[in-house]
Amino acid sequence: CEAMASIRLDFDVIESSTPSTNIHALIGRNGCGKTTILNGMIQAVTNPDNTIGKFIDTGYRLEREIESDYFSSLISVSFSAFDPFDPPEEQPDPSKGACYFYVGLKNREKKDSLRTIPELRADFVRHLVDCFRKKDKLVLWREAIRKLGTDENFESVGLIDLEEIYKQLREINKLEQVDSTEFRNLFLSEIESYLTSLSSGHSIVLFTITKIVSVIEEKTLVLIDEPESHLHPPLLSAFVRTLSELLFDLNGVAIIATHSPVLLQEVPKSCVWKINRVGDTLKPYRPEIETFGEDVGVLTREVFGLEVVTSGYHGLMSKAVDSGRTYEDIIIDYENKLGLEARSILKAMIIHRDKGLSK
């Protein structure tokens, strides 16, 4: 992608910083090139000789391209059924350089097809068993599930019970290898009721975190494409916090492509790139304001600017003001059903109109 070749994005991770700097965000409207950048990053790690984009290590006096083992592994996460990018084959062998793992819907064995729910669940169980049979992974998984419990609906499913079911099943089937297909199928049948009770968003979070815990090592890079497409805001925030603390423990970093201001609330502006497209050229900018903990409405205006003012309820307010009516008349037209934000915007627009200023 020529547009991508002309831009530079810096990602600085500062040790023990508050707030944490191990989650970075690329934000912009649909079609601005965020997913293209992420896919270029995947190619830069998995196939560096045949790609335009490069990762550069800036920790030296003379900057240089990273070595093949700079990242221990790369994990890409995308549950979009419409992304034309075909993920590479998984590469789990550290002797060949950075390992590569994919979390998502694409079926790499059957081009242009998606994985079924039974296939996704079978893959989840395989990685869940991997977490349960290794003490260090089990500790990470338990802690991740506990943190995700800040989302009440997630906690109510009782996913921490899965560990006890695994232990009981292993005790009953002592002669069965836990990594055998037979044991995994048996385990899946025992926990299926838990999985079917999950919403699609909760399933995606559980499957994603479990696979990440299963394969993550020191210095892992995680790339995630638009997680908000499937997650409501509290679950998105819980997921980002959980991921950040998991990466902190293992000296890893995540880069997330998003169009959700909710996600920006979880990261400082030094970790945010606004991506704008002008024709075929991509232009990255840092936000003008601090993003960590900022109001969603403020962040929306910061990122999308005029697009917000000319769309949705802003457009309706503008049209009502252009009709020449008074503030009180417009409130009556809307049967007193305007929120505080809409009323504030309406008042400002009317003041500007009556003074002969542009809105």
Task: Name every feature range the model reports, one short phrase each.
Residues 1-17, 68, 82-88, 101-203, ...:
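Extended helical coiled-coil dimerization/tether regions that scaffold
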Residues 6-57, 65, 182-316:
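Switch/communication elements of ASCE P-loop NTPase nucleotide-binding domains
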Residues 40-44, 50, 92-114:
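Extended low-complexity acidic/polar segments
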Residues 52-88:
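AAA+/P-loop NTPase substrate/partner-engagement loops
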Residues 73, 99-101, 253, 271:
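Conserved beta-strand segments of alpha/beta enzyme cores
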Residues 76, 102-104, 274:
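Structural signal for conserved beta-strand scaffold positions within catalytic alpha/beta enzyme cores
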Residues 87-99, 270-273:
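Short secondary-structure boundary/capping segments
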Residues 116-152, 245, 262-265, 270-359:
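RecA-like P-loop NTPase motor core
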